């Protein structure tokens, strides 16, 4: 079974332009993410999936320099980009680690791989419930990737709203009746602040990440992050104010998807 990690990344983010090349501990985010994911044993390749747009030339130039595998494809439809990349690399199962999910843990990547290998799922994603998808839980959706069977992408490509094919693609799998899906439920026994955001969407997230990585360096788990936050409560103030902004943007994108 050919299992590859796909990292969707593009430089034209409106909230934090060129975020994948922003540096943390003097290492660009995309390179730091790849370094962390190299600890996963059960994957063939780690592939950055970017677009054919000229605005992503700089990213591709960097990937070539660092000898990181990449694929350039459709700039308006991420699922088509995934499908085309899968055809090129003969991928059967995609482990979807978004380029701004820098905190994704190799341990949970391996868990998702195991679930996909041992069950007949088309799609699996981390969640805090077995029934209702909750994308606002930024602990789970910051450290746990999604698993996608390539053959299932064909089933959902026609369901995507023509006006917006870059966001809300996971929700298509979640909401489709033709998809065999599963929620990987993770309930931490540790206290998790509701305002914790383990992603890089806004400048405040970048500032927060720089603080975390300056303390913990490259290899750490969510438990280490929670301990740092408990010992340094002021760190959360950097990201508390943007949660409402994120939720507003998410809801607007879902309305258009």
Regions found by a protein language model. Give the residues of each.
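Short beta-strand/turn micro-motifs composed of small residues
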Residues: 9, 50-52
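N-terminal nucleotide-binding beta1-loop-alpha1 segment
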Residues: 1-16
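Conserved core of the sugar-phosphate nucleotidyltransferase
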Residues: 104-196, 207, 211, 227-257
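Short, conserved phosphate/pyrophosphate- and ester-handling motifs at nucleotide-, phospho-/glycolipid
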Residues: 202
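A short, N-terminal amphipathic alpha-helix
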Residues: 29-46, 59, 65-66
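Short phosphate-binding loop-to-helix
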Residues: 53-119
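Conserved beta-strand segments of alpha/beta enzyme cores
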Residues: 45, 69, 180-182
């Amino acid at each position: 079974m050919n299992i590859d990690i796909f990292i969707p990344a593009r430089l034209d983010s409106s909230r934090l332009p060129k975020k994948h090349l922003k540096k943390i501990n003097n290492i660009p985010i995309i390179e730091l993410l790849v370094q962390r994911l190299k600890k996963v044993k059960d994957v063939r390749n780690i592939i950055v999936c970017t677009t054919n747009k000229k605005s992503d030339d700089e990213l591709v130039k960097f990937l070539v320099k660092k000898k990181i595998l990449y694929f350039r494809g459709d700039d308006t439809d991420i699922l088509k980009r995934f499908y085309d990349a899968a055809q090129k690399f003969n991928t059967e199962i995609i482990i979807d680690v978004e380029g701004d999910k820098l905190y994704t843990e190799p341990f949970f990547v391996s868990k998702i791989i195991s679930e996909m290998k041992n069950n007949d799922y088309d799609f699996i994603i981390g969640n805090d419930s077995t029934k209702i998808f909750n994308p606002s839980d930024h602990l789970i959706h910051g450290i746990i990737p999604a698993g996608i069977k390539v053959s299932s992408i064909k089933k959902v490509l026609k369901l995507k709203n023509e006006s917006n094919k870059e966001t809300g693609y996971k929700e298509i799998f979640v909401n489709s009746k033709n998809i065999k899906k599963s929620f990987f439920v993770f309930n931490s026994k540790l206290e998790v602040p509701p305002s914790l955001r383990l992603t890089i969407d806004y400048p405040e997230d970048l500032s927060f990440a720089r603080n975390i990585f300056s303390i913990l360096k490259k290899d750490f788990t969510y438990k280490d992050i929670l301990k740092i936050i408990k010992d340094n409560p002021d760190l959360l103030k950097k990201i508390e104010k943007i949660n409402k902004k994120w939720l507003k943007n998410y809801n607007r994108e879902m309305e258009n998807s």
